[in-house]
């Protein structure tokens, strides 16, 4: 077989392989093809890109086919276009699902808060004179949004260097003498990585634009550090915010805590263990209460292995995070599980999870919410989003923008309930 013929055959085989990969990527977005082992990491990443950005995915698929179609034989070209057509239908439906995610979020809020709930936050807190709504969503904008809002960065709240730094997001014209509500953001990263910059930008930029102060923290990671160092740092940062946020125009009496993945776990645990001395060594008297919790795709039960834990999670916890076998020290795993600490005094919760989550099974959220609703006296809102993967809110997709608005509405209801009878001050622009 001559070189030209060999190149021709390779080109045809390559086109069929690309068509198969295209089809698999679209199918994976609807139903993850792997939930175990390292393959699940690829399933998650590809699913995240396809479900949150289906139209750019479609454009790249069709563009590649257009560029190569003339060099394909008629049968191969026909198969490639047929597969592309079915993939296009699937991707267009995913785009529609993302743009209409507000329907599921609205239904969740109506169910958890009642149909008479607030649907806007106007008039609840003092807003900057130029404050509006969140900017147009998009992944490119989210890459630079930090520069628009983070005006106080790398503030130390503890003794462990960069691991104990936090950033404060606010509009530059926010009244520093005011009492803006505060969002406290904890990054995810399997307790081993993650940074205060790069996560929850759609939510923080949306709330900062509306007059909130958002605090994003770092905390100590494993394997260099061992549980419960992570939650101790979260509590220490909370204590710092309570003591100092008024210097930046924030209200220490209204703090909503949030985070995704490991941050979802830590935010829930912090919300359910206010002033717990086990997690506040050396600062037991500090106030670490929060007024609301909004965890995203978190791990809520370290002991539920059969149907609600990724197979790689327990080895991670035993070898790198807790560093003890679960069977030898079950109490540590129970203490680290937010579900263990649910009580009637739990703050209002808004739990969000993707139904297609390949890394943290949705059963974690379902079980946690069921327990919360049975015990807590406060509202519990649960949004389970179809065709949605882990870390869906990382960049500025349509679904992430809808989610930011839904969180605003939830927090507006909580804020209004806790501030009934009070009036916000006038909007003030700072020159």
From Swiss-Prot:
Keyword set includes Aminoacyl-tRNA synthetase: no
Active-site residues per Swiss-Prot or TrEMBL entry: 261, 357, 390
Domain of life of the source: Bacteria
InterPro entries assigned to the protein according to its UniProt record, in alphabetical order: AB_hydrolase_fold (IPR029058), BD-FAE-like_dom (IPR049492), GDXG_lipolytic_enzyme (IPR050300)
Protein's cellular compartments: Membrane
Name the UniProt record assigns to this protein: Probable carboxylic ester hydrolase LipM
Entry's EC annotation: 3.1.1.-
Transmembrane regions: 7-27, 38-58, 75-95
GO CC field: extracellular region; plasma membrane
GO molecular function terms noted in the UniProt entry: hydrolase activity
Similarity remark: Belongs to the 'GDXG' lipolytic enzyme family.
Coiled coil: none
Membrane-related topology note: Multi-pass membrane protein
Keyword Transmembrane helix assigned: yes
Keyword set, alphabetical order: Hydrolase, Membrane, Transmembrane, Transmembrane helix
PANTHER family associated with the record: AB HYDROLASE SUPERFAMILY PROTEIN C4A8.06C, KYNURENINE FORMAMIDASE
GO biological process, one term: symbiont-mediated perturbation of host innate immune response
Organism: Mycobacterium tuberculosis (strain ATCC 25618 / H37Rv)
Enzyme class: hydrolase
């Amino acid at each position: 077989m001559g070189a030209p013929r060999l190149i021709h055959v390779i080109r045809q085989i390559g086109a069929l392989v690309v068509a198969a990969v295209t089809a698999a990527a679209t199918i994976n977005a609807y139903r993850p093809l792997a939930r175990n082992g390292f393959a699940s990491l690829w399933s998650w990443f590809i699913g995240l890109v396809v479900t949150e950005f289906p139209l750019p995915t479609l454009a790249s698929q069709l563009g590649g086919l257009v560029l190569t179609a003339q060099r394909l034989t008629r049968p191969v070209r026909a198969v490639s276009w047929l597969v592309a057509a079915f993939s296009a239908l699937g991707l267009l439906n995913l785009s529609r699902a993302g743009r209409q995610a507000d329907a599921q979020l609205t239904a969740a809020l109506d169910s958890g808060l009642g149909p008479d709930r607030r649907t806007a936050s106007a008039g609840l807190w003092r807003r900057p004179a130029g404050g509006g709504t969140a900017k147009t969503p998009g992944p490119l904008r989210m890459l630079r949004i930090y520069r628009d809002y983070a005006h106080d960065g790398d503030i130390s709240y503890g003794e462990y260097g960069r691991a104990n730094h936090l950033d404060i997001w606010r509009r530059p014209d926010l009244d520093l003498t005011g009492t803006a509500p505060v969002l406290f953001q904890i990054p995810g990263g399997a307790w081993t990585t993650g940074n205060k910059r790069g996560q929850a930008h759609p939510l923080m930029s949306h709330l900062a634009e509306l007059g909130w102060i958002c605090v994003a923290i770092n905390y100590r990671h494993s394997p260099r550090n061992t549980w419960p160092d992570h939650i101790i740092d979260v509590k220490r940062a909370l204590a710092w915010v309570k003591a100092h946020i008024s210097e930046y125009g924030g209200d220490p009496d209204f703090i909503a805590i949030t985070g995704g993945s490991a941050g979802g776990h830590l935010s829930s645990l912090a919300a359910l263990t206010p002033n717990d001395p086990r997690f506040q060594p050396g600062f037991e008297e500090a106030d670490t209460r929060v007024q609301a919790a909004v965890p995203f795709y978190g791990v809520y039960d370290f002991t539920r292995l059969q149907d609600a834990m990724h197979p790689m999670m327990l080895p991670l916890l035993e070898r790198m995070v807790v560093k003890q076998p679960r069977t030898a020290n079950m109490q540590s795993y129970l203490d680290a599980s937010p579900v263990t600490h649910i009580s009637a005094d739990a703050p209002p919760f808004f739990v969000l999870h993707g139904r297609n989550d390949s890394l943290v099974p949705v059963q974690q959220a379902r079980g946690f919410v069921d327990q919360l609703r049975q015990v807590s006296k406060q509202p519990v809102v649960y949004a389970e989003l179809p065709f949605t993967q882990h870390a869906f809110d990382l960049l500025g997709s349509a679904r992430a923008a809808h989610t930011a608005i839904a969180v605003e509405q939830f927090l507006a209801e909580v804020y209004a309930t806790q501030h009934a009878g009070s009036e916000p001050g006038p909007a003030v622009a700072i020159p």
